[in-house]
Amino acid sequence: QNGAKLRESVLTMTEEWKKAGFVDDGFVSYVSDEKVVAFPWTMIDKITPRPSEQIAADLENLGVEDMQPVITGKKTYIAPFVNAEKPQYLVIEDSFPNGRPALEKGFGVYMADRDTVNLSERMKVTVCLNPVHSATGPLGVVLGYDLFAHMLNTNEDMMKMARMVAYDEGLPVVADPGILSPQAFVDELFNDRFPNEYL
């Protein structure tokens, strides 16, 4: 529903601009007309944690200089690299009244209707991915783990619990969005994503 939130924010700004005399009623009408200006809903899933000092060290060992992350005054971590997982999902509502580039040619990009975008988000957030983190992450912290992957890779009981949350509790009740297979999504979590200690 991020498209709806973005639209609401933009319309609020245009109303304030109108009050301040920066734009006229025609501009507000134009931006408000969903047949002309769209705010497509999206679902994205790609883990991109803060820059890893280990990856920075690995890159420097390969001869790449000045890779160490920097912490800004606002406690934001930045680096000249991005450590991210290979799997990525970007589901975009195909609502572009003025045309669009062939976004679906991108790796992991899916064009869909609004209901499918919403189902994809619900699959990820309420059943397949987030519940596993919510159920096991806090216990991992109590048990002294710093990394989710390390916890699952070394603690049989935590892996068993994570698999139960996803396979036994989640998959039987998930609404299939049709463009992403919930079974394949969960299999990928346990075979590729969760074991990745670089994340």
Sequence positions of predicted segments:
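Substrate/ligand-engaging "lid" and interaction regions
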Residues: N2-L199
